[in-house]
C-alpha cells in the first residue's frame, strides 16, 4: 500500500483550535507510515510575508514534508484609500485584513501528479472546494481518507471521501504535549 499525506495547514489550524489541542507533525508522519509506504507528504500554508513561519516550515521540511506556500491575500479594512484622505500609512496598515491563501489548486496538482503511483491518500482538510478532486482521485482507483473534525468539514467533501476520521479520535496518537489549550468553541 502506497500512501500520500496532504495537510491543508489553514484548515487544520482552525480544526485544531476547535478541538483544543494541536498535533505534532512528526507523529502524523509516523501514523501515516503505519501499514503503508508513505511515498509523499505535503503541507500547504498561507504566509503574510516570505519570512512568516520560517522556523516551522524549516522543521516540516526537515521532517520530510514538501511545503507549499502562497501569500495570504490582503484586503484593506476601510474600502478606500486612507492616504488619499490625509490619514497616515500606519492607520491604513492597522486596518489590513488577511484572508485565506487558497492553496486548493496546489493540493489538486500535487495529488493528481502522484496519483499514478499511489494507492491511498490521507487528506487533512475541510475545504468544500476539494470535493471534485476527491471524486476524480476515487475514479482513478485511489482510496481517500479524510481527516478533519466535526463542524469544520464540508458535507460535500466528507461525502466524496471513502472514509472520514475525526481528528479528535486521534488525540492520543498525535497531540503535541506542550500545546494543550481549551477548545475555542466549548459548550457549557
For each feature predicted by the language model, list its residue ranges.
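Terminal and domain-boundary accessory regions
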Residues: 1-188
Amino acid at each position: 500500500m502506497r500512501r500520500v499525506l496532504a495537510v491543508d495547514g489553514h484548515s487544520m489550524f482552525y480544526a485544531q483550535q476547535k478541538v483544543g489541542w494541536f498535533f505534532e507533525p512528526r507523529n502524523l508522519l509516523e501514523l501515516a507510515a503505519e501499514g503503508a509506504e508513505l511515498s509523499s507528504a505535503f503541507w500547504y500554508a498561507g504566509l503574510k510575508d516570505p519570512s512568516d513561519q520560517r522556523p516551522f516550515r524549516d522543521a516540516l521540511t526537515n521532517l520530510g514534508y514538501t511545503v507549499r506556500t502562497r501569500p495570504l491575500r490582503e484586503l484593506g479594512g476601510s474600502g478606500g484609500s486612507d492616504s488619499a484622505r490625509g490619514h497616515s500609512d500606519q492607520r491604513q496598515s492597522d486596518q489590513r485584513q488577511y484572508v485565506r491563501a487558497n492553496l486548493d489548486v496546489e493540493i489538486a496538482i500535487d495529488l493528481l501528479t502522484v496519483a499514478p503511483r499511489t494507492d491511498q491518500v490521507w487528506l487533512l482538510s475541510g475545504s468544500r472546494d476539494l470535493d471534485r478532486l476527491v471524486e476524480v482521485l476515487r475514479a482513478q482507483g485511489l482510496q481517500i481518507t479524510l481527516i478533519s473534525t466535526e463542524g469544520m468539514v464540508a458535507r460535500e467533501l466528507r461525502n466524496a471521501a471513502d472514509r472520514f476520521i475525526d481528528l479528535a479520535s486521534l488525540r492520543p496518537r498525535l497531540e503535541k504535549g506542550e500545546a494543550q489549550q481549551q477548545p475555542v468553541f466549548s459548550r457549557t
